[in-house]
């Protein structure tokens, strides 16, 4: 894309030169020359260039005094069409100057003190399980597991250690960590272009929105698409690592709160007491850093955390004092990150982009570097990458799986047999596969829900959020299942430092959206931004669901259609968390508080999606039995977040792991007979 001299000058007013380079020389020129993704802005930039010429009244825009250039840009930015066109220029300027990306070190990163890998740290790659390849795949296994995330990984480990011959099918390529971090334009959490952890083209979904249905392919908006992570290890490859236990009330939501009209709250078929031994094992097997104290008083424990909690940092100190003034309990967040060397891997080096990016030293604990390597070490587990299960069949004597392998090259169809098929593809894809295969009852796909989120931020007088990880540091559970917020409330944690591009694009109120003052804020006061993030109960509804859409994927299968309804009780949770977050920040001395708001139904699915094959004691109100077997089937077992009847007031991954341990342990002890077709 060509930029005229006038547009280049405009870029340098959006990000002016001072003692640091201006926008064009500081990264935008190189970005524009190298990026293939900017075609969306071509018409807007042509209009903007022409309008600048008109406003300059015959003089080249580049020759005007900086103050005059700013005046004209402000005129443009105040009109409807001009505002949209100028916003396109501003976006490109910020992407070029503040976005980390492969092979580029724009000046904005140095301006804000951002280093993706801390100085002096030598990256360490994960030793991923090898690819068995098409030629190594047997046609007959004891178990075929679809998905390598926390549920599938746990199932693979327990079954392989029990002597069962296992095949894990993973849709993603065997990508190294280096390919899954450091690109702030395509990272899973902040992707503005095709996400690196996305499934790619040929994997459409339909978002059934109130205003109109929208077809999204695997290269589109990661948020609206409902992307978790298309990677070996699933979401645990890229997560922040918050590893909470659900509270006892989280397993009894219907009993504790009743069922508001239009909702489908249900109790789990297990209690916290039933789950506690599996939580203890999950923390040990995964590797969780934490400490006993205020955050563990309501979740009785039989073991201590295997790793010490991460040390303090400025935001924790400030918010801890504020919590104590309010009489709230607080503590360090339990994280599945190595706070010290563990399991043959290094300690966390506190990189500034833990959330949504792979770890530079393999200190982030997930399925890819814990459960699956242990499964492979038995000699009983194969992993087939770059492969998709397109159909599963349940039978009296065996189960069948149809797989498309080598999907990034010349695809090959494989027809495989197993005693058991474990479906662990996440709440959306698990439901889609079961529905497309004609498996299960009417509850398959229903009760899709996630969490409710609230973010409040302000400014304090000191630097509290420099670019140093791992990210979230302090939490309070005082508003979880207490009288302060209805319907179970949610956990409140400190907000992670926003990545440079995100911070530049969304400065705090009162800071100009571009120009000299904006750049000065980025260089200094940005680190004084203190936020509190709330994550709480979302009340499930039967019509929030995954169905089969009127689109086809590259194999001719129907894509998932996602419908999200928001119950008024969920909004009460969200608003309640915002009130308590503001209270905490005021106690910490923050000023200029503002609530970051998004659409009520930003996405029907996301990282925490659950409930689409929920467990229960009765097929009239659930999709599976208490051990993940869809009602009416013999040899199909679900083993992921789809099983969650409700999703708790905290992050769900440790519960996914603990429940997978319980489900897989039962499967080992109740293996289906190969001839009679029954489960003991």
PLM region descriptions:
Residues 2-135:
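Mature-region segments of soluble proteins
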Residues 331-336, 347-356, 390-393, 527-538, ...:
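A glycine-rich dinucleotide-binding beta-alpha-beta segment and adjacent secondary-structure elements
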Residues 158-161, 165-189, 378, 387, ...:
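Glycine-rich loop(s) and the adjacent beta-strand/alpha-helix scaffold that form part
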Residues 101, 108, 177-181, 240-242, ...:
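Short, solvent-exposed loop/turn and secondary-structure capping segments
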Residues 132-260, 264-265, 269-280, 440-462, ...:
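N-terminal glycine-rich phosphate/pyrophosphate-binding loop and immediately adjacent elements
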Residues 192, 199, 203-208, 218-224, ...:
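Conserved redox-cofactor binding core of oxidoreductases
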Residues 212-235, 239-240, 244-245, 250, ...:
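FAD cofactor-binding and catalytic pocket of flavoenzymes
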């Amino acid at each position: 894309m060509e930029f005229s001299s006038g547009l280049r000058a405009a870029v340098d007013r959006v990000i002016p030169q001072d003692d640091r380079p201006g926008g064009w020389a500081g990264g935008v020129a190189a970005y524009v020359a190298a990026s293939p993704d900017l075609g969306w802005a071509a018409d807007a930039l042509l209009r903007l260039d022409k309008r600048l010429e008109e406003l300059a009244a015959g003089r080249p825009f580049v020759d005007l005094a900086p103050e005059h250039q700013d005046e004209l840009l402000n005129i443009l930015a105040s009109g409807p069409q001009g505002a949209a066109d100028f916003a396109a220029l501003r976006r490109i300027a910020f992407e070029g100057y503040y976005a980390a990306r492969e092979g580029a070190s724009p000046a904005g990163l140095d301006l804000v003190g951002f280093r993706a890998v801390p100085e002096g740290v030598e990256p360490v790659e994960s030793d991923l399980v090898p690819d068995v390849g098409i030629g190594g795949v047997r046609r007959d296994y004891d178990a075929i597991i679809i998905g390598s995330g926390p549920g599938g990984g746990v199932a693979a480990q327990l079954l392989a250690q029990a002597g069962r011959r296992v095949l894990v099918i993973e849709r993603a390529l065997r990508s190294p960590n280096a390919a899954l971090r450091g690109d702030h334009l395509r990272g899973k959490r902040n992707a503005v272009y095709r996400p690196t952890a996305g499934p790619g083209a040929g994997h459409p979904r339909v978002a059934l929105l109130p205003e109109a249905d929208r077809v999204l392919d695997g290269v589109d908006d990661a948020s609206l698409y409902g992307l978790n992570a298309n990677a070996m290890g699933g979401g645990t490859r890229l997560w922040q690592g918050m590893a909470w236990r659900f509270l006892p009330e989280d397993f009894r939501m219907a009993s504790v709160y009743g069922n508001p009209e239009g909702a489908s709250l249900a109790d789990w078929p297990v209690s916290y007491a039933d789950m506690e031994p599996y939580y203890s094992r999950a923390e040990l097997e995964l590797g969780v850093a934490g400490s006993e104290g205020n955050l563990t008083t309501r979740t009785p424990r039989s073991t201590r955390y295997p790793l010490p909690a991460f040390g303090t940092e400025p935001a924790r100190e400030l918010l801890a004092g504020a919590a104590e003034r309010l009489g709230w309990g607080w503590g360090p967040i339990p994280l599945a990150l190595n706070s010290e060397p563990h399991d043959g891997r290094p300690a966390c080096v506190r990189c500034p982009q833990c959330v949504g990016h792979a770890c530079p030293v393999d200190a982030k604990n997930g399925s890819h570097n814990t459960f699956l390597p242990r499964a492979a070490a038995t000699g009983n587990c194969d992993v087939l990458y770059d492969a998709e299960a397109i159909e599963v069949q349940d039978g009296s004597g065996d189960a069948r799986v149809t797989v498309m392998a080598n999907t990034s090259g010349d695809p090959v169809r494989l027809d495989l047999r197993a005693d058991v098929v474990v479906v662990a593809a996440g709440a959306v894809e698990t439901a889609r596969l079961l529905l497309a295969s004609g498996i299960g009852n009417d509850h398959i796909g229903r009760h899709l829900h996630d969490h409710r989120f609230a973010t409040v931020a302000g400014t304090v007088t000191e630097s509290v959020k420099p670019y140093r990880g791992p990210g979230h540091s302090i939490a309070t559970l005082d508003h979880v299942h207490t009288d302060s917020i209805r319907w179970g409330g949610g956990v409140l944690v400190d907000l992670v430092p926003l990545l440079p591009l995100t911070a530049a694009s969304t400065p705090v109120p009162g800071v100009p959206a571009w120009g000299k003052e904006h750049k000065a804020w980025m260089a200094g006061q940005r680190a004084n931004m203190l936020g509190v993030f709330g994550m709480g109960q979302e009340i499930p509804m039967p019509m929030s669901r995954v169905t089969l859409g009127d689109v086809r994927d590259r194999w001719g299968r129907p894509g998932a259609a996602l419908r999200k309804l928001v119950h008024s009780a969920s909004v009460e949770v969200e608003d309640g968390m915002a009130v308590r977050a503001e209270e905490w920040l005021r106690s910490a001395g923050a000023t200029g508080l503002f609530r970051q708001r998004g659409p009520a139904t930003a996405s029907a699915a996301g990282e925490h999606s659950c409930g689409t094959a929920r467990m229960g004691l009765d097929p009239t109100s659930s999709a599976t039995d208490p051990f993940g077997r869809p009602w009416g089937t013999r040899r199909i077992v679900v083993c992921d977040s789809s099983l969650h009847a409700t999703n708790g007031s905290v992050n769900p991954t440790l519960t996914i792991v603990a429940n997978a341990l319980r489900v897989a342990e039962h499967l080992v002890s109740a293996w289906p007979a190969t001839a009679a077709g029954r489960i003991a």
